[in-house]
A protein has these predicted regions:
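Catalytic active-site module of serine/aspartate enzymes centered on a nucleophile-bearing elbow/loop
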Residues: 265-300
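Conserved alpha/beta-hydrolase catalytic His-Asp/Glu region
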Residues: 177-222, 226, 231
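Flexible "cap/lid" loop of the alpha/beta hydrolase fold
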Residues: 130, 134, 140-174
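Conserved alpha/beta-hydrolase "acid-adjacent" motif
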Residues: 248-254
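Conserved HGGG/HGGXW glycine-rich cap/lid loop of the alpha/beta-hydrolase fold
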Residues: 29-90
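Gly/Ala-rich beta-loop-alpha elbow adjacent to hydrolase catalytic centers
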Residues: 121-125, 129
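Conserved acidic catalytic loop of the alpha/beta-hydrolase fold
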Residues: 99-117
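Short beta-strand/loop motif that positions the catalytic acidic residue
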Residues: 235, 241-243
Length: 300
């Protein structure tokens, strides 16, 4: 029986369209660092917080990021930016820190002319969005947190977590430029294990283009030592907390800890091993429905 995946083909065409049509803008953060940002789609604004490493153009073929940004851009004006030190934003920067990540989010809110909007927060973007929402409660109408965590590995109770954090940071800084099979290939396997071999291989290659070996070590240090547990009770915006049950990048108990500390949150778990969810994951349609339903309530 011949089967044709029309929906998948349509999604790929839409992603190519978004990637080709987007115009890269630049703005300055408080300390003068140049930040690259884009917008796709139309309608009420949604802004994506910085998460893991990325690249505004390459994100459209990132198996775990492309589905969610495509889905949201199909219905809303989605504003995204590359965090300092990676992607199309400035790489030569004096400071890569959690506070600067929050400053950068504020700078893009201003540059895009957004007074108030929901935030799409993936991975450590959930912590950045938390801090931003506490600093600017009137500007955040809601937060979607995917694969989020309030405590970096080095701040967790387990000695094994702390040891892994140090080992991973050292390996990233030392072996980021290695050829296949590289640490980047291992990361792709951990982040999106159910993506196709070709998708993971491409993602691993793209990571090399997203950030320098020096900056990945600095970047990882910030992620490993973040701690927003004291800020969670101060977030007034409604939060949708989405985590996969068998996520190897960030354990689901971090998602539960995140949700339990937020005064106005809803927690949903998915039967998946992915950290970010590819379109081929059987749980993706349910996650997409949950996200769009939440945004229908809270996007102005």
């Amino acid at each position: 029986v011949l089967s044709v995946d029309f929906e998948g083909a349509e999604s790929r065409l839409r992603r190519e369209q978004y990637a080709n049509e987007q115009v890269v803008h630049f703005c300055k953060s408080k300390d003068g660092v140049g930040l690259a940002w884009v917008e796709n789609g139309s309608g009420p604004p949604i802004i994506k917080a910085p998460s893991w490493i990325g690249h505004l153009k390459l994100d459209w073929r990132n198996p775990g990021i492309a589905p969610v940004i495509t889905s949201i851009a199909n219905h809303y004006r989605l504003v995204r930016f590359d965090a300092r030190g990676n992607g199309l934003s400035d790489w030569e920067v004096d400071e890569i820190s959690f506070e600067r990540f929050v400053d950068d989010l504020e700078a893009v809110f201003d540059a895009a002319g957004i007074e108030r909007a929901p935030i799409l927060a993936i991975s450590q973007g959930s912590a950045v969005a938390t801090a931003f929402a506490v600093r600017n409660p009137d500007r955040v109408s809601a937060i979607i947190m995917i694969g989020g965590f309030p405590l970096g590995r080095a701040k967790r109770k387990s000695a094994k977590d702390r040891e892994r954090a140090e080992a991973m940071r050292s390996m990233m800084a030392a072996g980021w430029d290695d050829d296949y099979p590289s640490l980047r290939d291992l990361l792709a396997e951990i982040i999106v294990p159910t993506a196709s071999v070709e998708e993971r291989r491409q993602y691993a290659q793209d990571m090399k283009l997203m950030i320098s070996p020096e900056n990945i070590g600095r970047y990882r240090g910030v992620v490993d030592y973040l701690d927003v547990t004291d800020l969670l009770p101060k977030v007034s915006a409604p939060c949708l907390v989405l985590n996969c049950q068998n996520d190897r990048m960030q354990p689901i108990d971090q998602g539960r800890l995140l949700a339990s500390g937020l005064p106005n949150s809803r927690f949903i778990s998915y039967d998946s091993p992915n950290h970010t969810v590819p379109e081929s994951d059987p749980e993706w349609p349910r996650m997409e429905r949950d996200i769009l339903s939440f945004l229908a309530e809270h996007a102005a």
